[in-house]
């Protein structure tokens, strides 16, 4: 998973005509650490997509713009638009994440 470190990088990446997945996280977040323990297998399953992570504390304006209230959250973007958002309350298990991706990735 590649790291997004600037607003410019983020804005360029989301313009892709294929779906990209962005994980919003924070270093202090226990649920983010828990997700990191299982996300590797999901990355392998959905390896046709580009995956990125973005530290909400480093780029808070992006988290606010895309209504990321809790972390971890997974957002899917295509052609500059957010097409899906898995809120932190529903991102606690591999099954929840896989179900979300199977519903929203074409």
Swiss-Prot record:
The UniProt record lists the keyword Electron transport: yes
InterPro entries for this protein: Thioredoxin, Thioredoxin-like_sf, Thioredoxin_domain
Gene Ontology, cellular component aspect: cytoplasm; cytosol
Induction comment: Activated by SigB in response to ethanol stress.
Cysteine disulfide links: 29-32
Entry-linked PROSITE patterns: THIOREDOXIN_2
Gene Ontology MF term list: protein-disulfide reductase activity
Keyword Oxidoreductase set for record: no
Keywords: Disulfide bond, Electron transport, Redox-active center, Transport
Domain Thioredoxin: 1-106
One Gene Ontology biological process: cell redox homeostasis
PANTHER family, per the entry: GEO12009P1, THIOREDOXIN-LIKE PROTEIN YDBP
Stated role: Participates in various redox reactions through the reversible oxidation of its active center dithiol to a disulfide and catalyzes dithiol-disulfide exchange reactions.
Family: Belongs to the thioredoxin family.
Name under which the protein is recorded: Thioredoxin-like protein YdbP
Lineage, broadest ranks: Bacteria, Bacillati, Bacillota, Bacilli, Bacillales
């Amino acid at each position: 998973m590649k790291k997004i470190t600037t607003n410019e990088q983020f804005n360029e990446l989301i313009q892709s005509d294929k779906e990209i997945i962005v994980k919003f996280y924070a270093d202090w977040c226990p649920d983010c650490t828990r997700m990191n323990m299982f996300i590797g297998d999901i990355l392998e399953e959905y390896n046709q997509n580009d995956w990125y992570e973005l530290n909400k504390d480093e780029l808070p304006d992006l988290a606010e713009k895309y209504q990321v209230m809790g972390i971890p959250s997974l957002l899917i973007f295509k052609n500059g638009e957010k097409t899906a958002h898995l809120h932190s309350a529903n991102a606690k298990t591999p099954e929840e994440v896989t179900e979300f991706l199977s519903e929203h990735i074409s």
